[in-house]
Regions:
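Mid-domain alpha/beta scaffold segments of enzyme catalytic cores
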Residues: 1-272
């Protein structure tokens, strides 16, 4: 029996899936990934994500938000537009939002303002926050902590931070999203060293597909050799398998815990 899985972060609207999106979904479901949260990073994508979920209501939901890379691009009425999007039942979280001081595609002060506004929106709409934190030097936690009493929930997406970062997030009661980064014995070693600090009842798993293909993934099937570097939601089980090995538990334990956590945080029903 295949364990049922929830991919809480898949960029299913990426152009990399344009030629075979339906087949990607079919492969995911065949692999037990029957619930997917589509990550959206700006207003246009959030609108498209909402439309996709309405057209495909069984097992699909999305986020709505502005990624820190796009903070510089928001217009005067961006928050009003996002507020309307966030009200839709298909939208299960505000985000992807946060801070990225690694690349600074948007000026830090704009990132901070746009992130802060979305935290207020999450509190006002009762939606959890889907958080991006890269090299923020504690600023993401500082803002989250400022709003913490009003936020219904937080997941730190694609966590690759430090031991101290993890301790702070866990002490605050946040969920932690783990991707195929943990499957990389070289780049992911620091994460491997600390990941089991995450209690199973705070663990969420995600592919971040089409990015971060797990290093323990099998070779693509015949006909998909040209996608050998592309990640897919069907490979979420590779993340669960690596985590099960690190925790010293069964694959089913990781699958069940992450499924229940996703249900709790995002108010997800079982698929029909």
């Amino acid at each position: 029996m295949i364990d049922r899985l929830t991919d809480i972060g898949v960029n299913l609207l990426s152009r990399q899936f344009d030629e075979d999106r339906e087949a990607v979904v079919e492969r995911a479901r065949a692999a037990g990934v029957t619930r997917m949260l589509i990550t959206c990073t700006d207003l246009a994508e959030s609108s498209l994500g909402q439309a996709f979920c309405r057209a495909n209501p069984d097992g699909f939901w999305c986020t709505a938000g502005v990624h820190p890379h796009h903070a510089k691009d928001v217009g005067r009425d961006w928050l009003d537009q996002l507020t309307e999007l966030a009200k839709d039942p298909s939208v299960k979280a505000v985000g992807e939002t946060g801070l990225d001081f690694n690349r600074n595609f948007s000026p830090p002060e704009q990132q901070l303002a746009v992130f802060d506004a979305q935290l207020t929106l999450a509190a006002d709409t009762g939606k959890p926050v889907f958080v991006h934190d890269r090299d923020s030097e504690g600023k993401v936690f500082e803002l989250l902590n400022r709003h913490r009493g009003k936020l219904p929930g937080v997941v730190v997406h694609c966590f690759t931070g430090t031991r101290l970062d993890l301790q702070l997030y866990l002490k605050a009661g946040f969920y932690i999203g783990i991707t195929g980064w943990v499957c990389d014995a070289r780049r992911g070693q620091d994460l491997r060293d600390i990941v089991t600090m995450i209690p199973l009842d705070r663990l969420l798993i995600e592919t971040d597909a089409p990015y971060l293909r797990p290093h323990n993934a099998p070779a693509p099937p015949p006909g998909l050799e040209h996608h050998k570097r592309r990640n897919e939601p069907a490979l979420l089980g590779c993340v669960a398998a690596q985590l099960a090995q690190l925790y010293g538990v069964d694959h089913a334990d990781v699958a069940q815990a992450s499924w229940q956590n996703a249900s709790r945080l995002f108010d997800l029903p079982d698929p029909a």
